[in-house]
């Protein structure tokens, strides 16, 4: 086992349900702790014992590969007993309600529940029924706090700061919990945020969240330090939000020409999974300015930091 992190940060919240409600100090503390875990994860011995004897349940009502795997790796590296539970193998398929599931799981005394659900607000409702700590791994189009934190860590490590940077968030903002969490975090940390996309994919009144709005990529990427592309979420669309994937790419997909509208040293991000040829082309996604793979690495470190920060609030911690 490796030595404990130098950071003594304790999150002043029992759960992590969203970025909303966190302070700038909370975010800085989590990012600092996560930075220590980045270095740990690059060593041969990646294990710590901070969650030894604790049970972590990953409860995913929506399919996930990278987020669920990231939380599983994070928990195991911290020494937790990790159980993965998907809706396809659960009693929810047999008619059990979300609250029944929460009460049933609570009777098994898990210490930490990591929950993803297709309905906005569902994770908060579940958190009211359990005694352990709950981490929101994405709820509908509401929030995805650990994604915003890992994005912030990625930006900070590459640009040295968040304050004063211009972040262009491009694409399907309307259906994106990633966009919402990032907007809240980046505003809180002093960055400028500009959302870019067709009017059909931008929430009405989004200016009230303190962002700039652009409806074409040339204007939207002008002066951008970071270009954050979003997946076109057709599974959440009930109508014709865009004419076709090819036409969408023509106007809003990121290629080398559109990337040239941003600053010369601009960096590219994407929360994944990527639809290559729809919101981003392979040359940019795999190019020298892309941080996509680094985001995945930062995700494990951030989730380790979140789990440890919450564990420090658990009884007998």
From Swiss-Prot:
EC number: 2.1.3.2
Pathway noted in the entry: Pyrimidine metabolism; UMP biosynthesis via de novo pathway; (S)-dihydroorotate from bicarbonate: step 2/3
Enzyme class, broadest EC rank: transferase
Reactions that this protein is recorded to catalyse: carbamoyl phosphate + L-aspartate = N-carbamoyl-L-aspartate + phosphate + H(+)
GO molecular function, one term: amino acid binding
Key words, A-Z: Pyrimidine biosynthesis, Transferase
GO biological process, one term: 'de novo' UMP biosynthetic process
Top-level taxon in the UniProt lineage: Bacteria
GO cellular component: cytosol
Binding-site residues for carbamoyl phosphate, renumbered to this chain: 66-67, 116, 144, 147, 272-273
SUPFAM superfamilies: Aspartate/ornithine carbamoyltransferase (SSF53671)
Function noted in UniProt: Catalyzes the condensation of carbamoyl phosphate and aspartate to form carbamoyl aspartate and inorganic phosphate, the committed step in the de novo pyrimidine nucleotide biosynthesis pathway.
Family: Belongs to the aspartate/ornithine carbamoyltransferase superfamily. ATCase family.
Protein name from the UniProt record: Aspartate carbamoyltransferase catalytic subunit
Species of the source: Afipia carboxidovorans (strain ATCC 49405 / DSM 1227 / KCTC 32145 / OM5)
The organism's taxonomic lineage, starting at the top: Bacteria, Pseudomonadati, Pseudomonadota, Alphaproteobacteria, Hyphomicrobiales
Gene: pyrB
């Amino acid at each position: 086992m490796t030595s404990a992190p130098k950071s003594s940060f304790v999150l002043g919240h029992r759960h992590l349900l969203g970025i909303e409600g966190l302070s700038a100090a909370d975010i800085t503390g989590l990012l600092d702790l996560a930075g220590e875990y980045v270095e740990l994860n690059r060593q041969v011995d990646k294990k710590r014992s901070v969650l030894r004897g604790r049970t972590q349940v990953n409860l995913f009502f929506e399919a996930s590969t990278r987020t669920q795997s990231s939380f599983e790796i994070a928990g195991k590296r911290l020494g937790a007993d990790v159980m993965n539970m998907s809706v396809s193998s659960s009693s929810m398929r047999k008619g059990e309600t979300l609250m029944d599931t929460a009460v049933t799981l609570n009777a098994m005394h898990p210490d930490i529940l990591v929950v993803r659900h297709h309905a906005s607000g569902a994770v908060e409702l579940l958190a009211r029924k359990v005694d352990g700590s709950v981490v929101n791994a994405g709820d509908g189009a509401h929030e995805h706090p650990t994604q915003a934190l890992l994005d912030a860590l990625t930006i900070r490590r590459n640009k040295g700061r968040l304050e004063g940077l211009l972040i262009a968030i491009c694409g399907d903002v309307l259906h994106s919990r990633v966009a919402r969490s990032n907007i809240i975090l980046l505003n809180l940390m002093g960055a400028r945020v500009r959302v870019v996309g067709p009017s059909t994919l931008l929430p009405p009144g989004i200016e009230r969240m303190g962002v700039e709005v652009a409806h074409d990529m040339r204007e939207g990427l002008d002066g951008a330090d970071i270009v954050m592309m979003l997946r076109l979420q057709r599974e959440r669309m009930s109508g014709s939000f865009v004419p076709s994937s090819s036409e969408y790419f023509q106007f809003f997909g990121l290629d080398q020409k559109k990337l040239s509208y941003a600053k010369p040293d601009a960096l590219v991000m994407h929360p994944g999974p990527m639809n290559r040829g729809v919101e981003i082309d392979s040359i940019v996604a795999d190019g020298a300015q892309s941080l996509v793979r680094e985001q995945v690495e930062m995700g494990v470190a951030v989730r380790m930091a979140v789990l440890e920060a919450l564990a420090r609030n658990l009884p007998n911690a």
